[in-house]
Each structure stands twice: as structure tokens, then as C-alpha cells.
């Protein structure tokens, strides 16, 4: 069974852009596309039955319109549509189960402000069991930039970023693109209290050779599995979010991993994913750690 690419829509230009992007990605991967919307009426008694029926009818027509536009652009693509009643977060997280990826729209506000992601989107990213891809409205008709890489962040031990690396290499292989793997590093806090240790570290060649080897070790199994995908490793000292964002000029997609962070307020995303999804000018895929 081929897992579908699922796109969540709400009728906005951003969600139409997400649907167009999802359609192209489904064609590249040979996967079916599922177009989904959630509609949520106020509590019983606030609306009468006719108004509830209007909500449901609007959702069905909106999904049908968007699904039809994607199907017209890709006649051989299998497209299904679904409108469900319920809170958007619950519906989208449920739709993410069994999907290869869930695609959502993001609102664009210019290169300096970055794009804002609503609370629904952030909660879905934090809870979804599959990669969540965020697409801006101005990405609707733009073909994926030829010559640009799939940029992926790698951190920690090889297994820590395995899911993100797998998604990045699969996407690159489907597009005939390269992978630019980025690892950011910083000095451990101990060096602030022990200048002598820093001198010894410099004499030993510094930390960058270790970080370069760590990235090479993480990439090795994916290079072997995808020998046709060109790979450019990039190791740089600095904040992981800032180092990744500095690569956006070379990216047609940025891929970051996501660990589950739980608090009294519920699931939340980490600082690196938060920085990238709010400031990257290109589509961003947030991949849960396996």
C-alpha cells in the first residue's frame, strides 16, 4: 500500500498553494493525494440545523473545488477528498496517521517579517505522526527551483536525525536534486570557565574535525542507500537555527527534525524548528523523530 500525501485546506490562498505543492509532490512520489478539510460548528444551540448544514456544505464544496483544481493539473493523479466535522487540530492529526506527509499552508508577510504560523498549525506540527510540510501562498505555481538543494539539519548522534535525513534523501531522489546536510556546533559551556582547556583544544585541532566526522557518519548510510543523490556537507559554528536559515538561498525545501516537547500547555515544537518555520522563505518540512 502506498501512503498518501495529505493536504489540509481551509479555502485560503495559502491552503490552495499547499494543495498545488502537494499535488506535484504526490506525482513525483507516485503516491495518491488526499485533500481534507475540517469544519467545526459552535456548540449546540448557537446555530440551528440549517446553519450547520450550510457549514458542512461549504466545507464539502471548498474541498471539491480545490481537489478538482489539482486533479485538472495532474489528470493521472489519484485524488480523494474528505470534509470532517470537528476541531481542526484533532482532524488533521488523525489524517496524518498513515500519510507519507501532511501539507499545510503558511501565511507570508514578506522577507523581513517572515511568515506567521497559526496556533492550529503549530499544534499539528507538534503532534502529527508524519512529516508536516509548510507552504507559502507564493509557492503555489512556482516549480521547485532547478539547481537548488534539499537542505536538511543534522544534530547529535546519527540516529537522532535519521528520520529527517531519510525524508530529505527520498525527496531529493524524487526530484533529481542534491542534499545539503547542515550541522551547527558551539563550544561546550565548560570552555567559558577554563580558558586553558580552550588553548589545548586549539592545539589539538579544534572541535570542527570532530563535528565534520559526526556529520559524515550520520550521512554514510543514506549515501549508500541513495548513491545517485549528490551530497554537500556543511559544518559551521553557530546557532542551529541561524546556520540553517543562512542556507535558504540554496534551498528548494528545508527539512528539520522534531522531538516531542511536552508541558502543562501541551505538545510544542523545539527552538530550531520554530525559528526555521517562522523565517524560512521556502517550504519547510518538520519531521518527527522515529
Predicted regions located by residue number:
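Structural beta-alpha unit
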Residues: 1, 14, 69-102, 109, ...
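Small/aliphatic-rich secondary-structure junction motif
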Residues: 1-49, 148-201, 223-226, 230-232, ...
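General small-molecule cofactor/ligand-binding pocket signal
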Residues: 34-36, 80-84, 133, 180-182, ...
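A short acidic, glycine-rich active-site loop
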Residues: 51-62, 200-211
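Glycine-rich, Arg-bearing micro-motifs that act as flexible, cationic patches
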Residues: 104-123, 145-147, 253-278
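Short beta-strand elements of ligand-binding domains
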Residues: 105-106, 132-137, 285-288
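Short, structured interface segments
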Residues: 121-141
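Protein-protein interaction modules outside structured cores
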Residues: 209, 232-246, 250-290
Amino acid at each position: 500500500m502506498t501512503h498518501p500525501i495529505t493536504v489540509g485546506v481551509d479555502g485560503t490562498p495559502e491552503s490552495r498553494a499547499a494543495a498545488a505543492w502537494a499535488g506535484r509532490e504526490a506525482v513525483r512520489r507516485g503516491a495518491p493525494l488526499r485533500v481534507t478539510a475540517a469544519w467545526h460548528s459552535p456548540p449546540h444551540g448557537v446555530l440551528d440545523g440549517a446553519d450547520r448544514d450550510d457549514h458542512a456544505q461549504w466545507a464539502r464544496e471548498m474541498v471539491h473545488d480545490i481537489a478538482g483544481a489539482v486533479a485538472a493539473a495532474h489528470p493521472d493523479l489519484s485524488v480523494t477528498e474528505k470534509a470532517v466535522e470537528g476541531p481542526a487540530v484533532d482532524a488533521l492529526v488523525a489524517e496524518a496517521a498513515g500519510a507519507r506527509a501532511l501539507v499545510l499552508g503558511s501565511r507570508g508577510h514578506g522577507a523581513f517579517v517572515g511568515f506567521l504560523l497559526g496556533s492550529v498549525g503549530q499544534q499539528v506540527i507538534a503532534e502529527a505522526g508524519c512529516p508536516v510540510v509548510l507552504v507559502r501562498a507564493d509557492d503555489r505555481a512556482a516549480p521547485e527551483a532547478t539547481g537548488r538543494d534539499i537542505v536538511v539539519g543534522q544534530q547529535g548522534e546519527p540516529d537522532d536525525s535519521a528520520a529527517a535525513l531519510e525524508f530529505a534523501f527520498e525527496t531529493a531522489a524524487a526530484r533529481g536534486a542534491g542534499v545539503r546536510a547542515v550541522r551547527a556546533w558551539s563550544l561546550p559551556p565548560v570552555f567559558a570557565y577554563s580558558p586553558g582547556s580552550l588553548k589545548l583544544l586549539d592545539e589539538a585541532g579544534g572541535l570542527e574535525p570532530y563535528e565534520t566526522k559526526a556529520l559524515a557518519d550520520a550521512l554514510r548510510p543514506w549515501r549508500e542507500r541513495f548513491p545517485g543523490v549528490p551530497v554537500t556537507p556543511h559544518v559551521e559554528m553557530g546557532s542551529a537555527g541561524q546556520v540553517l536559515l543562512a542556507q535558504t538561498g540554496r534551498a528548494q525545501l528545508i527539512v528539520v527534525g522534531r522531538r516531542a516537547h511536552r508541558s502543562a500547555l501541551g505538545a510544542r515544537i523545539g527552538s530550531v524548528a520554530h525559528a526555521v518555520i517562522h523565517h524560512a522563505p521556502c517550504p519547510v518540512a518538520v519531521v518527527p523523530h522515529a
